[in-house]
Amino acid sequence: MAIYAVVGTQWGDEGKGKIIDFLSSKIDYVVRFNGGNNAGHTIVVNDKKFIFNLLPSGVLQGAKCILGPSVVIDPLILIQELEVLKNNNIKTEIFISDKAHIIMPYHIKFDELSEQKKGIHKIGTTKKGIGPCYADKINRIGIRTIDLLNTEIFANKLKTNLEEKNQIIEKIYNDKPLDYDDILNTYKKYIEILKSLITNTEKILHHAINSEKYILIEGAQGTMLDIEHGTFPFVTSSNTLITAAAGCGIPISKIKQKIGIIKAFSSRVGSGPFVTEISNSIGDIIREKGQEYGSTTKRPRRIGWLDLLTIKKAIALNELNHLALTKLDILNNIESLKICIAYEFQGKIYDYIPTSCETIEKVKPIYKVFKGFKEDISNIKNYDDLPIEAREYIEFIEKEVGIQISILSVGSEREKTIFRNQEWSNI
């Protein structure tokens, strides 16, 4: 038995999808433990691109897929993704936790109206209803998948919630109320499609652990978007750390292989402090070469140099023991590369990320500058064949964070991967 966990070390979009995809080849179960359809992951197989927002990345390898209790589910999006599997003749088993919460139309409406009302102070959400759904969960009025299995219970909860939500929509936001019958009838159709997938996933996972199955736990977004430890309030609405996987019913002590994914540069979507942001043409070049546009929103991502303070924080919080570096190939033909090693503000040097966003906005990055490499590295298979400049960049990261980078991604396709030890190449 082995239980692997994969998390992002930055603001999401690190390339977790590709790494998870090939790790899943010998995995029995892939478990998604947080987030909703605000998190997009892209996988390229045989030159065909797949983009999923809810289904785990490992679904393409035939592993059994579990959407855990802390995932919030938009039924329409999930049904559309199941259709993609069907249309591409991808066969797998999907299990939805009966404790997972359901995104309702009023959640999406609230997300849109709230962002509009904030104006220039908006968070930059995906407007998918994620935050309002988690808010209802914490407020103990959310609708769970188990409620969908009893039409009377679902209808009553919807009626109670919608009466309150429509009051707010009309009186606070001066907008049109949502129609109860329309929502009920639409969701009844969703229920017919999804009801056979809803089950006690905790029981399934306990049986898998006792049967010594291989399990891969997949996190959405990244450490710096964690609701507790990220750049609050410019964060997501769930816990993105490996510790949140306990919500699936898997004891943290069972997770021995903890893999952090680092993109060779930084990016973030939406508002919030971004110390290493590149505000010149180099940022534009990296964005276009790396196709750094949100797979969910299509919004252009903000681009920055690699920030080691975020990586060190992610390693400490997640207790990572393995690292994978992605998109190194995107950095070729750039004259100088930079890595942020500390912050400075009013003569004070920070070797950690301040808690206050107001402080983070004011700090200046302290950089280590590296000579760039010109070669196209996308077809290189062995580490020693990389340009010396690329190896110096990688080895500096390793020296600073104290963990070897075991996996290097030099292209979006599965085969464009360099393994630095036998353990990973045999998976």
From Swiss-Prot:
Residue positions of the active site: 13, 41
SMART domains: Adenylsucc_synt
Binding positions (substrate): 295-301
Enzyme class name: ligase
Cofactor note: Binds 1 Mg(2+) ion per subunit.
Cross-referenced NCBIfam families: PRK01117.1, purA
PANTHER family xref list: ADENYLOSUCCINATE SYNTHETASE
Binding site for Mg(2+): 13, 40
Descriptive protein name: Adenylosuccinate synthetase
Designated gene of the protein: purA
Subunit details: Homodimer.
One family name in Pfam for this protein: Adenylsucc_synt
Annotated positions binding GTP: 12-18, 40-42, 301, 327-329, 409-411
EC annotation from Swiss-Prot or TrEMBL: 6.3.4.4
Residues noted as binding IMP in the record, renumbered to the chain: 13-16, 38-41, 126, 140, 221, 236, 299
Keywords assigned: Cytoplasm, GTP-binding, Ligase, Magnesium, Metal-binding, Nucleotide-binding, Purine biosynthesis
GO BP terms, alphabetized: 'de novo' AMP biosynthetic process; IMP metabolic process
Species this chain originates from: Borrelia recurrentis (strain A1)
Family: Belongs to the adenylosuccinate synthetase family.
Primary residence: cytoplasm
Function: Plays an important role in the de novo pathway of purine nucleotide biosynthesis. Catalyzes the first committed step in the biosynthesis of AMP from IMP.
GO cellular component: cytoplasm
